[in-house]
Amino acid sequence: MKSDIEIAQSVALQPITDIVKKVGIDGDDIELYGKYKAKLSFEKMKAVEANEPGKLLLVTAINPTPAGEGKSTMSIGLADALNQMGKKTMLALREPSLGPVMGIKGGAAGGGYAQVLPMEDINLHFTGDMHAITTANNALSALIDNHLQQGNDLGIDPRRIIWKRVLDLNDRALRQVIVGLGSPVNGVPREDGFDITVASEIMAILCLATDLKDLKKRLADIVVAYTYDRKPVYVRDLKVEGALTLILKDAIKPNLVQTIYGTPALIHGGPFANIAHGCNSVLATSTALRLADYTVTEAGFGADLGAEKFLNIKVPNLPKAPDAIVIVATLRALKMHGGVAKSDLAAENCEAVRLGFANLKRHVENMRQFKVPVVVAINEFVADTEAEIATLKALCEEIKVPVELASVWANGAEGGLALAKTVVRVIDQEAADYKRLYSDEDTLEEKVINIVTQIYGGKAVQFGPKAKTQLKQFTEFGWDKLPVCMAKTQYSFSDNPSLLGAPTDFDITIREFVPKTGAGFIVGLTGDVMTMPGLPKVPAAMAMDVAENGTALGLF
């Protein structure tokens, strides 16, 4: 089997102007970034707003292994299969962060024969969205420090600045830094730090904004610091929301590319699901819904993170809720949840599949709480045995959830046809009746307890001293009606990454809340979730190179 990049480079790409015609987009509706990439114009997005939205398919997964379970690959393969069936389909996915690409992943544009192209561009600088977000974020940091230096009219307490700088790389050495050292002309010395760009609130804002006006309003609503008397300081107090919007005026436009099979794909935005809401942009998803009969989108990590946030945070900003949810499961992950060591996952173990099924079962039950039909997709791997597959199918039948084996990595669209047919059948036979898990009127405490007990299966929530104080403060500031975005490990339902399967007798501890008032949610911090990742001992970057003719090498 060829590597992902070898497969990608063997494909004769079609001009993006030809690809977009499939969904009614003309050359005048796009802004080209070379022959194979483009951005969609504001005019076209506005023109299709009155269109009736098509069907929306949300792809999510069980709690993953460190290698991931193939949601992006499955999403791409499913969209290609639907198109092959004659259904006018678009993809709406996140764009990769350079940090994980250079770190552990090596690439994030699907895999095998289910990829979005040109994968080298998508994985590296793409159309510059990440750089624009990084620049806007760091411009705000510079403007805050300049305000301190120029007299500090707002009375900002330098010890209580919560806005950090960002970089689109994994760089643990920058997690905590001191700025303003050297002399009085270098600014006011203070503690600062760097997050990875995809953890920036500006990334979340870009992905939830519905147009430029909404983007500007959300940027103005960002809380950057507190005054000496503990009052919040907003971007609007600094009067720089216009400048930040200007930096982002092109980045807010969704990017158009293609799959190996020529399916049009909107790739836009990429917040992490363990520290943010983990979904691509509202603009991309909404526009795809109005251009195509079927839109396939994904939410990051397991359904306890990305899908929960998609359904509670993103859906209220979309023209409609999902018509079906596809939960991706792999036998290797189920065996890991069933107690098998990583080194033994290749060996057949039907009993471990039975034990690990508890994880998948809870995800199915959780998604059914939202009153949306669920389908299970088994992402096939070479090491899977017929006995293990039969075991998993039988277990799915016991809980009456449709299940299909999909081999899109190895076989592309053909490998996803059975899944696509089942998804279409389920949508035709069972209408979704979307129900949100909580109300905006619930308190922050009630929202957290609801997520922990109803989605994670936890027993109770423990609020640390700082979190308890913040619950009172945030209510006084009027932030208590915002949804909650939990920052939690992706590997477990709990806040302990080693507690696999479907644990029940556990508490979740909220140590702190972080206001993301521009994005429109409050983050609850659990465990030791990092907002600036580090690199592994052997980074993926060590396998990367470029040929003399400029061809990328080693992007997995």
From Swiss-Prot:
Q: Which organism is it from?
A: Streptococcus pyogenes serotype M28 (strain MGAS6180)
The UniProt record lists the keyword ATP-binding: yes
The record, for CDD domains, names: FTHFS (cd00477)
Q: In which pathway does it act?
A: One-carbon metabolism; tetrahydrofolate interconversion
Protein's name in the database? Formate--tetrahydrofolate ligase 1
Q: Might you give the EC number(s) for this enzyme?
A: 6.3.4.3
One MF annotation (Gene Ontology) recorded for this entry:
ATP binding
The keyword Thylakoid is assigned to this record: no
Q: Which GO terms describe its biological process?
A: tetrahydrofolate interconversion
**So what does this thing catalyse?**
(6S)-5,6,7,8-tetrahydrofolate + formate + ATP = (6R)-10-formyltetrahydrofolate + ADP + phosphate
Instruction: Summarize where ATP binds, as residue positions.
Output: 65-72
